[in-house]
Amino acid sequence: MSTLPPGTAPIKPQYLLSTKPQAIPDDDAAEGTTSIVKSAGRGEDDSGNGQPSRRALAKAQKKARQGANKGRRFGKVRDEVELCWKVANGAICDFGTSCRFTHDIAEYIKEKPQDLRIPLLSEFKESPPYGPDLTVIGKPGKKHPNIDFSTKCPVHEESGECRYGYKCRYMGGHALEDEEGNVTLVADEDKKAQVALTSHEINFVGGDVQKQLRSKKYPTPIASAYLEELKSMNDEAQKPQAVVSETTVMETDEAQPSSTDAVASEATQNGTEPAPAEEVISKRVGGVQSGKDEPDVPMRFSEKRRLDWKGKTYLAPLTTVGNLPFRRMCVKLGADITCGEMGLATSFLAGSKEEWSLVRRHPSEKIFGIQVAGNKPHTLVPTAEVIAKEFPTGVDFVDLNCGCPIDLVFKAGSGSALLDNAGKLGKIIQGMNRALGEIPLTVKIRTGVKEGRNNAHKLMPRISAEWSASAITLHGRTRQQRYTKLADWDYIKECVAAVRAREADEDLPPVPIFGGGDCFSSQDYWEKINNYGVDGVMIGRGALIKPWIFTEIKERREWDISATERLQLIRDYVEYGLNHFGSDTAGVNTTRRYLCEALSFQYRYVPIGLLERLPAKINERAPAFVGRSDLETLLASPDSQDWVKISEMFLGPAPQSWVFTPKHKSNAYGSEEGQG
């Protein structure tokens, strides 16, 4: 047995390069960065001259290498000569000669970069140079040496046609060259008909809808009616009202507008009972005036689609890395439930093209949800109504994010900030529920905001029984905690018990409850299911580091996956990425960017064949090590330049102008530091 510091992954001595554990990247810090945030000056002394002290300088240098790269920007890489999209697909351009893109197909093909190809797994080996030279054309055209007629286009192979036409970097896979050198595009009509419903992404929002949203002309009558009710209720709450007791009559003026159910709840928490009328309103209509035409709380079970999630695996919604190609790969590996990346309600209502792209769904995603974040009913309820109207059959549930810890979201009153505002949260959930119709609403929360001040055990029974959420997921950490601290599964168990007790008291069917935090193996997963009362475990970081965890869970085993098998998963991701982001030059390099993002997590995986003890723990830090082959060592490299090299094994050489900036600064330094 090796002697390693506590909290260090127990790697067998023969694979160790150093006994010093490498720093775990701060996932919270990286998640909290945006392209508009600027780095603040660190370590300045108190003299006011802006000069750092020696001690502060040393601390700042250390922190600078451990923090997040703020303001990351990824420019779009385009062809030097840009062909008109309409002409590229054999159509007629509406702009004619005034089009700002070229219509000269022959000239474009002449200047176009050479075709790419995705090597087969059998072409790779586990020692350098690992794979074939992708700069070599397999079957060049007679008059077009830059076209490879032996390549296969992943888009054409899947759907029978390629929507990128002449712009496709794998054009030789769906083109023919005649004796005179003319190149024509071809399609597989039989395959197009066969896969029309199984390969095409769904949940597209058209330009007309985006325009309506931008101009604030999109009709949301359900949301408008609900918000008007809230306004009337708040106006009524601000009026002086007579409160009758057994001994006296007195005039009171409410200090702040709040929903009736929130007032009733606060009274109960203070040890007093709410007035009978308030109690009835609170339980049955959740703070909306009783005179309105409002469905009862039990509507969740009689009219909402029921969520049968027992025994199903759930891939957590993940910002940036939880894109459609990654979700598709996880589905192939065994994930049953998937959810899109978090979208902001304000951006949805502004008609943001980028935000609405987050709701796309691949047909292989069996149970799919859209996650929304916001800070008030006035944005979240209309967003829910738009989603319900645009995708009545394209979404299985909508998830309200009440767990996001990042500063940008929290300080705006969204995400985990809602955990400390039960009155507002109740209004949001009830309003979204009404706007969504039969589409279920789920809620993702944390144990609380501040460490030592958990409140999920109070909120969850209300979220389920009182506010009618159809499922709850609970991450076992507060907003204040960092990933270096373990999730509190004992508290998760306490929260589940509180919900089940409330449901039993009110004779309500149980809603699915999923816990989350630190699940990194099949053994972890089933231990949580068997001992903590949850219906399932939402898996986030565990899936980012080892997407095959879903296979392990389904097969109840720990998979000592080989480097070659991991390479196959990378190849799958590349094909899925090209289908989603595009097979033209821009799409190839967008796929490259997100592949590198995925590898920024997957390099952290320590092959279980190298460990002295199983199962591996997600928070154990790995010392520098070598794998069982050069390829396995490469896949474990913390150097972001090595991730780019891996991308080049499938996507060809990266353009000189293309640079990948990792989220974590420590990954931007040479791997020699990590090996020291």
UniProtKB/Swiss-Prot annotation:
One MF term from GO for this chain? zinc ion binding
Q: Provide the alphabetized UniProt keywords.
A: Cytoplasm, Flavoprotein, FMN, Metal-binding, mRNA processing, NAD, NADP, Nucleus, Oxidoreductase, Repeat, tRNA processing, Zinc, Zinc-finger
According to the record, the residues making up region (Disordered) are: 1-72, 253-298
Localization, UniProt: Cytoplasm; Nucleus
The biased composition feature labelled Basic residues covers 56-72
Domain of life, per UniProt, equals Eukaryota
Q: Which GO terms describe its cellular component?
A: cytoplasm; nucleus
Q: Which Enzyme Commission number(s) are on file for it?
A: 1.3.1.89, 1.3.1.-
List residue spans of C3H1-type Zn fingers: 78-106, 152-177
Q: What residues does FMN bind to?
A: 317-319, 371, 444, 475, 516-518, 540-541
Q: Where is the active site?
A: 404
Question: What PANTHER family does the record point to?
Answer: TRNA-DIHYDROURIDINE(47) SYNTHASE [NAD(P)(+)]-LIKE
Its job: Catalyzes the synthesis of dihydrouridine, a modified base found in the D-loop of most tRNAs. Specifically modifies U47 in cytoplasmic tRNAs. Catalyzes the synthesis of dihydrouridine in some mRNAs, thereby affecting their translation.
Protein name from the UniProt record:
tRNA-dihydrouridine(47) synthase [NAD(P)(+)]
Q: Which organism is it from?
A: Coprinopsis cinerea (strain Okayama-7 / 130 / ATCC MYA-4618 / FGSC 9003)
Species lineage: Eukaryota, Fungi, Dikarya, Basidiomycota, Agaricomycotina
